[in-house]
Amino acid sequence: MAEACVENVEVVPAGFLSHEHPGSEVDFVFSRNALHQLPDLWKAIALQRVHALLRPGGVFRLRDLVFDFEPREAEARVAAWVEGAVDDPAKGFTADELEAHVRDEFSTWSWVLEPMLERVGFEILDVEYVRGAYGAYTCRRT
């Protein structure tokens, strides 16, 4: 963050389930493309830990692969998602990577994740979905 001339931000690469925060509650937590590594049971526990890390009113910004369509649409929507992949891995996910993701990772549904966020004590302030597979949430600790 030094090159961005930001002095009040500390980047802490850490596991949702293993991180032991040594200080006081924080103002902001950002996660990108990490939560889908956990099955839903552990997602809820991870989100509860993030909630506990934030001060009341603190903000959690979550960006991840989240499916925002109905189960009956899954085959067609996943096929379209994979079809829209890039060829150059430097520009994004390739078709092989997206296929592996669906096969091996734990992305969940928007209608599962949103109640999970609320259950652990977050207020969802803003939600955006792109291509039915990428979710961005801005949440506040209540």
PLM regions and their residue ranges:
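A short His-aromatic
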Residues: 36-38
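Core SAM-dependent methyltransferase catalytic element
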Residues: 114-142
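Conserved SAM-binding strand-loop segment of SAM-dependent methyltransferases
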Residues: 4-18
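A short acidic, Gly/Pro-enriched loop at the edge of an enzyme's catalytic core
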Residues: 21-29
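A conserved beta-strand element that flanks and buttresses the S-adenosyl-L-methionine
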Residues: 30, 61
